[in-house]
Curated annotation (Swiss-Prot):
Glycans are attached at N50. Induction: Expressed in the late phase of the viral replicative cycle. Residues 49-64 have a biased composition (Polar residues). This is Inner membrane protein H108R.
Amino acid sequence: MVNLFPVFTLIVIITILITTRELSTTMLIVSLVTDYIIINTQYTEQQHENNTFSMPQKNSFSESYNKDKKSNTHIPYQWLAPELKEAESKYWWGNYDPHSEPVLAGAS
């Protein structure tokens, strides 16, 4: 059975777009429709993931790949530590003293 709700919604939206000439109303309707499509798509993807009948095939490559994969939420910045220490001792956010800078010969 085909779900007729999206078709009905599309017909109503097209009718409103034809009869309405205001841009703000049109943009509101378009944003509501896109939100509905995004939410509906995410919901169906989640349903598909929760489906017990379609078990994903596992092999050693995918298991080792998923085991070796690191999360993208935390990026280590240890390589930046020496530069930050140098900048901290050199610039205003550290203990910068303009009078401790070497004076060039011949500079007035």
